């Protein structure tokens, strides 16, 4: 019985160690985050599909919740910043009004990509459907492939 309890305890400790290690990004990722967001404290880290993701409050974005993505080498791939409808460029909101009037709700997120390009992710909702579209700042629909997936 004593061996059994020791074995179970050991396995439990190993599981905890491995699960915790996956939530701590490598030093290169932490350093990139600190360089890119020196005024922000790192928040909740997660790791999926080869990408380290951190959600945090950023002073540069009106203390809003921001999510930044880094690859395993510490390269900053993109940043997701939720936007109020009033802060989104007019061509984007105009296009949503004209092309998606059947949707009762639209949430906007600006995605700043590493190369300097930005796209707006528009999550549209109504009673029966959800749809996500991507637009550039001129309101043109575009394809977006997340570099962190």
Task: Go through the PLM ranges and name each one.
Residues 1-24, 33:
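Bacterial Sec-dependent N-terminal signal peptides
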Residues 20-149:
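Interaction-mediating elements
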